[in-house]
């Protein structure tokens, strides 16, 4: 099983678009898009990871 990852090096960003491209985090929460997910990754100090693309 290949690990899926997202490059969050440009984050955090102060505002995210409303674009809906869901990602499922390691906390089993569905994030609406990469921006929302990456902001959460930064807030978690890198403990949050990507489970898979799409809804959880």
UniProtKB/Swiss-Prot annotation:
Keyword Repeat: yes
Residues glycosylated per entry: 45
Compartment(s) of residence: Secreted
Any GO MF annotation of the entry: serine-type endopeptidase inhibitor activity
GO cellular component: extracellular space
InterPro entries: Bifunctional_prot_inhibitor, Kazal_dom, Kazal_dom_sf, Prot_inh_Kazal-m
Site for Reactive bond 3, residues: 18-19
Protein name: Ovomucoid
Originating species: Chrysolophus pictus (Golden pheasant)
């Amino acid at each position: 099983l290949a690990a899926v990852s997202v490059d969050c090096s440009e984050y955090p960003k102060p505002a995210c678009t409303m674009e809906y491209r869901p990602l499922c985090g390691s906390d089993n929460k569905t994030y609406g898009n990469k921006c929302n997910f990456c902001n959460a990754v930064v807030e978690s100090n890198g403990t949050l990871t990507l489970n898979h693309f799409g809804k959880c």
